[in-house]
Amino acid sequence: MIYLVTGQQKLFENPNYKTISIEESLQLMKDCKALQYDSETSCKNFHLGNILCIQFGNKAKDFQIVIDCTTINILLYKDILETKLLIGHNLKFDISWLYNYGIIPRKVYDTMIVEQLLYMGFPRIPVYPDRYEKYNYDFPYKIVQSDKKGTYYELSFSLQALAQKYLDINIDKTVRGEIIWRGLDTSVVLYAAGDVTFLEDIMWKQVKACKEKECLVGAKLECDFVPVIAYLEWCGIKLDEKQWRAKMDKDKEALNKSLQALNNYAIKHPKLQKWVKQDLQGNLFSGYDTESKWTVDWQKKESIKVVKALGFNVSTISKQTNKESESIMEKVLSSQKGIDDTFLKLYFDYQGCYKICSSFGQGHLNIINPKTGRIHTTYWQIGTVTGRMSSGGTTDEDLAKFKKLPINDCKNLNFQQLPHDAVTRGCFVSEPNNLFVSCDYAAMEARAGAEVYNEKVLLDEFLYGSGDTHAAYAKVVFTEELKDVAVKDIKKIRPDLRNKVKSVEFEINKIFI
C-alpha cells in the first residue's frame, strides 16, 4: 500500500495512494527493524538545493510511505532515520542531504556498494548479448546502443541493472528528471514509492551471494563506511584563497622560466631550425625584431615531430584503441637516456610546471562553494578495480550554474593526488579555533601483501627496521642509485626514487588483492 504524508489539502481521494497523517506514518514504522529508504531532491549539490520528498518502504508490512518535505518538517522523522537499518541504493547521496538537518543515520545497507564489492575487479568491457548467454555471465548491465559496435551490455551498478538481474523487473526512471517542475503529482508519488519497493529483495539476494563468496564481513564494513564518506563530502575542506593565489603566481612564474629555457635550447639546436623563425624584413610601423622565435606550442601535436627530429622513439600502444600511436609523455621518453638528456630535463621540467598550473590553479577557486566557503569534491569508496578509494572525475553543474561559470570550469577535484610540497598543502587550512588531525594506516596493503607472500625483506623491515616499505622497494628497484643509502635514510636523501617506486609497489600488491 502506498501512503502520502503532505501538508497540502486534497479535494479528492486518489485511488493510487492514501493520504495519512504524520502520526499514522510514524506508527506504521515504529516496530520496523529495517526500512527501505530513498529521497528526491531539487538538484545534486546538497549545499545548494533542497529535499523535495523522502520515501520509506517495508516488505513485511507491505507499505511505501512518501513524505512531502516541502510541507512536512523532516526532523519529525529524525529518530526513525537514526535508529532503523536503512536499506538504500547509493545512500552516500541521500545521507549527505540529511546532514544538513543534523540527522545522522547509524545503520545502513547500500545495495550499490555491496554489488560493487561482489564484482570488484570485473572489467567494464563491451559484452554482446550472445556471448553473455553463451558464457553464463551474471553481472548487472546496462544496454548500450552504438553505431560502431551495435548493441552490447556494459557493467552497471544502477538500481535498474540490479532489479533486472536479481528480480527480472524493469524500473522506469523517466519521471526522475521531471520531479522539480511536476511537484508531487500522482506519477511522482508512484515513482518515489517504486524506488523503495524492491531494495529489500535485492539485499537478501546479495547477502546470499556474499555468503557464497565469503565476503559478508567485507560487505558490512563497506556499508558501515557509507555514512563516513558521505560526511567527508558534506564537510569539504577550506582553501585559503589568498595563499592559493600567491601560489598560482609563483607557479606561473616557474612555468614561464621553464618554457623560456626549453625554447632557448630548441632555438639553438641544429636539428630543430625548421621550427625557428626570424623576422629579418620588418616594417615601417613595428620596426625590426631579428631575435629568433620558437614557433611550436609544446602542448600541441606538432611537438611530436620536434621530439622525433631529436631522435626519440615516440611509438606506443594506445590503451583506448589498443593500436600503435605516438606519444611524448614522460613514461614513453624517460627510458630513452643518452639521446638528448639536456632536452629531456628541460622538457620534463616544463611539463611538470604546466601540469601544476593547469591542475592546481584556478579550478580550485572555481569549485569553492559560496554557501560553505569550502571545496566539496566527490569520493568513491570502491573507486578502482582493486577496491581502492578514488575522488573527483565529475562536474558540479549545479555549482557552475550558481556561480554563472561554464560547466566544465567546475570540475570536482582529485584530492588524493595533491602535490607533496608544503606550499600547496599549506593552502588547505582549518577553520578558526580548529586544528587539522591527520592520521593514516601505515602501508596497510604492503603489510598484508608481505604476510601473504611471506616476503622476508618486507617482514624484516616491518618487524625490525624503519617500517618504510616504499623505501624498501626503492632499495630493491634502484640498486645502483641507493647502494650506499640505508633504507631508513632514503626518504630524506632520495625522496624522488621513493615516490617513483610506489607504482611498482601498488601494482604488485594489486595482484594479491
Language-model-detected regions and their locations in the chain:
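Hydrophobic helix-and-loop "lid/oligomerization" segment in the mid-to-C-terminal part
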Residues: 511-512
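Cytochrome P450 catalytic domain signature, combining two hallmark sequence patches
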Residues: 106-107, 123-126, 256, 313-318, ...
